[in-house]
Swiss-Prot record:
The TSP type-3 repeat ranges on this chain: 457-491, 492-527, 528-550, 551-586, 587-609, 610-647, 648-687, 688-723
Subunit details: Oligomer; disulfide-linked.
Gene name as annotated: Thbs3
CDD domains tied to this protein: EGF_CA, TSP-3cc
Biased composition annotated in UniProt, kind: Acidic residues: 555-568, 612-628, 650-667
This protein's UniProt keywords: Calcium, Cell adhesion, Disulfide bond, EGF-like domain, Glycoprotein, Repeat, Signal
Biological process annotations from GO: bone trabecula formation; cell adhesion; growth plate cartilage development; ossification involved in bone maturation
GO cellular component term of the entry, any: perinuclear region of cytoplasm
Domain Laminin G-like: 22-193
Annotated protein name in UniProt: Thrombospondin-3
Source lineage: Eukaryota, Metazoa, Chordata, Craniata, Vertebrata
Pfam families: COMP, EGF_CA, TSP_3, TSP_C
Organism whose genome encodes this protein: Mus musculus
Length: 956
């Protein structure tokens, strides 16, 4: 065969090697799978491949924001949400999590480390499932063409029954039933094929399988033909002859050598018995000697362990010089034979090592571990209130801890403390608080305002003193209140005249009184109003379209009534399946015309979005089955058997922190050995704690790692809640039928920390969207009118429109003017009620709320102020609520100025095990809820202890 022909054959074989490995390859673009029939067909292909294919690949290109994550691909059962196969990115801890159904029915999870996918950049990830039908499949993760991690010998995948195929669902790019943040460029699943072929699809030069080489070899043999085979056969026979000839020559040489030695012995010594060459032994002591035919007639075995040489002469091996087996700083002593290491150097602990031979010395090196002197129970000998820092082989004593003054020689003494008035930095009208890191802070008492070190009277209890205070830190709460008698915690002043808008009769300074001004906060002397609403053109976000609510969802300055793209997602309202919620991808899994981003039942068709009980779950998928009573139905609860209304899931593994033994998934259990984890919400497997205060370095000042330091964080153990904010709220109307009164009108000020209700309205609620477990909730209540005498208050543990707690206050005794369906009489005084209405909003709940007392199947009166004193016009009151739903603890206190005027005492009720917060009004106008503050708190107060004992004895 000529060379050109041979090169052509080789080229053809190379082409075959590339294509032969991909004969059964199927590529499916998952982003195009939409219709149910198409999804069933794709699911059947995947099911078949799991049973028959050699390998299955998931190839995706996407971009995730830093520390974000979500499900890349999942194959689930619609009926019971069984997770057959799922691959997700856990951005916070830099891994890919693969979960699948095992043959025993349990879910198996595989962590693939070193992913580095959630960093705001575009990555290509290839997940290879090797041998899914084998008893022990494997997983490989390639990130940007490089192998990141792999696992072999995994438990077998459970086969998907054929009957399940029609009920299978494929999900891509999701996080908690919503689209995950970022951008998914492509998502393909490849059934069968080789790594070489898949690498070509992703432009990655992966090596092919051995099967390709075998195919090339087979093809080459078939092309070269019978003549070459015959030639190869002859060459093989020739080679065998050469081997036999070489063996014959070797035997001849041995025989000739024996004859020569015999002749020489006969000539020199005559004919006598042959002398042994091994007696006496010419070999080194302890080395075996063997008689041989070759000169000099003997052969010595190998030198003993620890020695080297030819068997005749053996010298000691210096293991210390050649293997360096001892820890740096520990002396190595060479012996004859062998070596030994002396004790570990000071500051280290370990074992002495000794042995014989280079191999042993290299495999058994001495290990000495650093001694952490700072954890010896004596702070390393440093002052107990100072910082001890461990170093490699030693330690050093540092400065005094936070809250202490001094040095190592004089000792560290408390600088500020809450335990002793002599060391307390707080004002006489302030109370001392311990922060999480041991620092001390001060907070002015109710009726006083300032920075805590300096406090002054605060008549309207809005957090600002009546007179300016000489504070060293220039704290804003030391500035004089611009409305002394009317709460305005935001200190808004549109015309900058030093008088706050809340008490300025001409807030914008345009010469027109507020009651007559159609733009209270914008100067407009001409009072021009082009449309028919009550807002002048100068302050109307739709000057030519009537819109009294002035709603502006996307905050672009253009009201929703005249904005062609209300949510600002780039999709016109008429084409947007979520007109008021940004969703540029327009994902709609249930194909009901309502996008998943705003769908109250994203997996079940409900185009009308009916939600009769206002619990944010559509009626068609609302089961109202809530085993733990935390306001989340079991099918959507990440801890269905433990109350956790906040649904906090720090590691995004689908298991709520309340029932997750390792909240941050760093391998250190939260509470049990080898824990407890000193940073329970932030991954830190090394548990480094430089100052030894029990809090890891990575979460020292920010326990939940939400970029808000703990003293300023209202929920230091939840990265989802940082500040009090009611700007996003849900309006719940409790008497939606009839037109006797109008609905409430809520105005939110001070960045969500102040709410004003302006209308004489039907009963209604403004409910925030943040749900709480244990919570402390406080605020200032003020009725800014003298023309009405009805109900106002606040609510907590809101779960739906028929289940919540409400604290409500009536000014005077009054019988409700509608006696249907029953007569309702309101008594003056503060009341605490548990609403457990079986009917929900309507006339029954309306009259039950008005009535002071129990109403079967509607409202239970838990407590009422025995003074029967109503609120006074234009007077500020401060409430403080403590609620610990895990034990049913409730306590409400009410202050008028600095004086405590009402205290419910400890009340035990477990009707609602957590929920959302909000405010309440019923037929009362001009209510101000100012200086609102909430704080997550699961610590049970000390005054619960007597009730705990009674609960254990079954007496409560």
């Amino acid at each position: 065969m000529e060379k050109p022909e041979l090169w052509g054959v080789l080229a053809l074989l190379l082409l075959c090697s590339y294509t032969c490995g991909s004969q059964d390859l199927q590529v499916i673009d998952l982003l195009t799978v939409g219709e149910s029939r198409q999804m069933v067909a794709v699911a059947e292909k995947i099911r078949t491949a799991l049973l028959t294919a050699g390998d299955i690949y998931l190839l995706s290109t996407f971009r995730l924001p830093p520390k974000q994550g979500g499900v890349l691909f999942g194959l689930y059962s619609r009926q019971d949400n069984t997770r057959w196969l799922e691959a997700s990115v856990v951005g916070k801890i830099n891994k890919v999590l693969v979960r699948y159904q095992r043959e025993d029915g349990k879910v198996h999870a595989v962590n693939l480390q070193q992913a580095g996918l959630a960093d705001g950049r575009t990555h290509t990830a290839l997940l290879r499932l090797r041998g899914p039908s084998r008893p022990s499949p494997g997983l490989q993760l390639y990130v940007d063409c490089k192998l990141g991690d792999q696992h072999a010998g995994l438990p077998a995948l459970a086969p998907i029954p054929p009957a399940e195929v029609s009920g299978l669902e494929i999900r891509t790019g999701q996080k908690a039933y919503l689209r995950m943040q970022g951008f998914v460029e492509s998502m393909k699943i490849i059934l069968g094929g080789s790594m070489a072929r898949v690498g070509a699809l992703s432009e990655c030069p992966f090596q092919g399988d051995d099967s390709i080489h075998n195919a090339v070899t087979s093809a080459l043999q078939s092309i070269l033909g019978e003549q070459t085979k015959a030639l190869v056969t002859q060459l093989t026979l020739f080679n065998q002859i050469l081997v036999e000839l070489r063996d014959d020559i070797r035997d001849q040489v041995k025989e000739m050598s024996l004859i020569r030695n015999t002749i020489m012995e006969c000539q020199v010594c005559g004919f006598h018995e042959q002398r042994s060459h091994c007696s006496p032994s010419p070999c080194f002591r302890g080395v075996d000697c063997m008689e041989v035919y070759e000169y000099p007639g003997y052969r010595c075995g190998p030198c003993p362990p620890g020695l080297q040489g030819n068997g005749t002469h053996c010298d000691d091996i210096n293991e210390c010089a050649h293997a360096d087996p001892c820890f740096p700083g520990s002396s190595c002593i060479n012996t004859m034979p062998g070596f030994h290491c002396e004790a570990c150097p000071p500051g280290y602990k370990g074992t002495r090592v000794s042995g014989v031979g280079i191999d042993y010395a290299r495999a058994s090196k001495q290990v000495c571990n650093d001694i952490d002197e700072c954890n010896d129970g004596n702070n390393g000998g440093c002052d107990p209130n100072s910082i001890c820092t461990n170093t490699v082989g030693s330690f050093k004593c540092g400065p005094c801890r936070l809250g202490f003054l001094g040095n190592q020689s004089q000792g560290c003494v408390p600088a500020r403390t809450c335990h002793s008035p002599a060391h307390s930095p707080c004002h006489i009208h302030a109370h001392c608080l311990f922060e999480r890191n041991g620092a001390v802070s001060c907070q002015c008492n109710v009726g006083w305002a300032g920075n805590g070190n300096v406090c002054g009277p605060d008549t309207d209890i809005d957090g600002y003193p009546d007179q300016a205070l000489p504070c060293m830190d220039n704290n804003k709460h030391c500035k004089q209140d611009n409305c002394l008698l009317t709460p305005n915690s935001g200190q808004e002043d549109a015309d900058n005249d030093g008088v706050g808008d809340q008490c300025d009769d001409d807030a914008d300074g345009d010469g027109i009184k507020n009651v007559e001004d159609n733009c209270r906060l914008f100067p407009n002397k001409d009072q021009q109003n082009s449309d028919t609403d009550s807002f002048g053109d100068a302050c109307d976000n739709c000057p030519n379209v009537p819109n009294n609510d002035q709603k502006d969802t996307d905050g672009n300055g253009e009201g929703d009534a005249c904005d062609n793209d209300v949510d600002g997602d780039g999709i016109p309202n008429g084409l947007d399946n979520c007109p008021k919620v940004p969703n540029p991808l327009q994902t709609d899994r249930d194909e009901d015309g309502v996008g998943d981003a705003c769908d109250s039942c994203p997996e079940m068709s409900n185009p009308t979005q009916t939600d009769a009980d206002s619990d944010l779950v559509g009626d068609v998928c609302d089961t109202n089955e809530d085993s733990d009573g935390d306001g989340h139905q079991d099918t959507k609860d990440n801890c269905p058997q433990l109350p956790n209304s906040s649904q906090l899931d720090s590691d995004n593994d689908g298991l709520g922190d309340e029932c997750d033994g390792d909240d941050d998934n760093d391998g250190v259990p939260d509470y049990i050995p080898p824990g407890p984890d000193n940073c329970r919400l932030v991954p830190n497997p090394n548990q480094k704690d430089s100052d030894g205060n029990g809090v890891g370095d990575v979460c020292e000042d920010d326990f939940d790692n939400d970029a808000v330091v703990d003293p300023l964080d209202v929920c230091p153990e939840s990265a989802e809640v940082t500040l009090t904010d009611f700007r996003a709220y849900q309006t719940v109307i409790l008497d939606p039928e009839g037109d006797a009164q109008i609905d409430p009108n809520w105005v939110v000020l001070n960045q969500g920390m102040e709410i004003v209700q302006t209308m004489n309205s039907d009963p209604g609620l403004a409910v925030g969207y943040t749900a709480f477990n244990g919570v402390d909730f406080e605020g200032t209540f003020h009725v800014n009118t003298v023309t009405d005498d009805d109900y106002a208050g606040f609510l907590f543990s809101y779960q739906d429109s028929g289940r919540f707690y409400v604290v409500m206050w009536k000014q005077t005794e009054q019988t409700y003017w509608q006696a249907t369906p029953f007569r309702a009489v309101a008594q003056p005084g503060l009341q605490l009620k548990a609403v457990t209405s079986i009917s929900g909003p309507g006339e029954h709940l309306r009259n039950a709320l008005w009535h002071t007392g129990h109403t079967p199947d509607q409202v239970r009166l838990l407590w009422t102020d025995p003074r029967n004193v109503g609120w006074r016009d234009k007077t500020s009151y401060r409430w403080r609520l403590l609620h610990r739903p895990q034990v049913g603890y409730i306590r409400v206190k009410l202050y008028e100025g600095p004086q405590l005027v009402a205290d419910s005492g400890v009340i035990i009720d477990t009707s609602m095990r957590g929920g959302r917060l909000g405010v309440f009004c019923f037929s009362q106008e001009n209510i101000i809820w100012s200086n609102l503050q909430y704080r997550c708190n699961d610590t049970v107060p000390e005054d619960f202890e007597p009730f705990r004992r009674q609960l254990l004895q079954g007496r409560v």
